[in-house]
């Protein structure tokens, strides 16, 4: 066939989709990462240079800074933080309907031209970028930053056939607490703890508040409607 390259972005590529493409078409899906404000690619795996679980290396000519996030440490030899970039592909700014003809530069720190992605990433010792989640999709529990997306992945590992979504709510003892919404009525803390032990992680990733739903609310794109779930907290 003529199909040579398949690149996935927008959300994390599941292992089941990756395996299905290899089995059916013999093609490895290459995962990438970007933003509309960056026209739109920031990092991508290539056929010759790829690492599973990452979104590849930053494109050439992209300067980057990882701003420290309190409660979030990096493994030895790696870097972790909130990603800011400066590059030729970063837009000049936004055109607002209510202010025609005026370019509103993106928020930045330091020199103009920087763009704050709003994403927390980890860059490993070989320069591969690993997306850990949106800043707004982290909770600070007992002083430690916990990725709500990573907690969702944990739920998927414990219950592959269910649908799961995680939010956080204020907690007097720990600052914030996890709330897991799931369509699997049999999913409990014991199965989540087992998944942590099997795949690695922290006890802080195990939700104490687990709520069963017949179906999770979704947007027109098929993604989870977190705004609707927040109304249930």
Residue ranges and their predicted role:
Residues 64-66, 101-108, 119-123, 166:
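A structural signal for short hydrophobic beta-strand segments in well-ordered beta-sheet cores
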Residues 87, 92-93, 113, 118-205, ...:
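AMP-binding/adenylate-forming catalytic core of the ANL superfamily
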Residues 42-46, 67, 86, 97, ...:
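Short beta-strand-to-turn element immediately C-terminal to the catalytic PLP-Schiff-base lysine
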Residues 57-61, 72-107, 144-146:
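Conserved ATP/PPi-binding loop(s) of AMP-dependent carboxylate-activating enzymes
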Residues 30-37, 41, 56-58, 167-170, ...:
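Beta-strand->loop->alpha-helix junctions that form or flank phosphate-binding loops
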Residues 10, 34, 56, 119, ...:
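Active-site glycine-centered loops adjacent to acidic/histidine catalytic or metal-binding residues
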Residues 172-173, 209-221:
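Short proline/glycine- and acidic-rich turn/helix-capping motifs at secondary-structure junctions
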Residues 1-51, 63, 70:
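Gly/Ser/Thr-rich phosphate-binding loop
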């Amino acid at each position: 066939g003529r199909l040579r390259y398949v690149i996935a972005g927008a959300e994390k590529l599941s292992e089941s989709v990756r395996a299905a493409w290899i089995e059916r078409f013999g093609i490895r899906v290459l995962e990438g990462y970007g933003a509309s404000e960056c026209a739109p690619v920031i990092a991508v795996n290539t056929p010759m240079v790829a690492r599973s679980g990452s979104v590849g290396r930053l494109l050439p000519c992209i300067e980057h800074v990882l701003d420290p996030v309190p409660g979030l440490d990096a493994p030895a030899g790696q870097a972790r933080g909130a990603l800011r970039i400066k590059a030729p592909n970063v837009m000049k700014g936004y055109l607002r309907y209510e202010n025609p003809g005026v370019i509103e530069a993106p928020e930045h720190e330091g020199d103009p031209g920087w763009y704050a992605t709003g994403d927390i990433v980890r860059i490993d010792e070989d320069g591969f970028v690993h997306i850990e989640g949106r800043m707004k999709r982290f909770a600070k529990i007992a002083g430690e930053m916990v990725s709500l997306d990573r907690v969702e992945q944990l739920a998927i590992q414990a219950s592959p056939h269910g649908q799961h979504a995680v939010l956080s709510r204020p907690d007097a003892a720990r600052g914030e607490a996890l709330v897991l919404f799931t369509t699997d009525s049999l999913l409990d803390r014991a199965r989540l703890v087992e998944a942590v032990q099997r795949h690695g992680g922290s006890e802080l990733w195990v939700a104490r508040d687990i709520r069963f739903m017949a179906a999770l609310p979704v947007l027109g794109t098929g993604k989870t409607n977190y705004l609707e779930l927040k109304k249930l907290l």
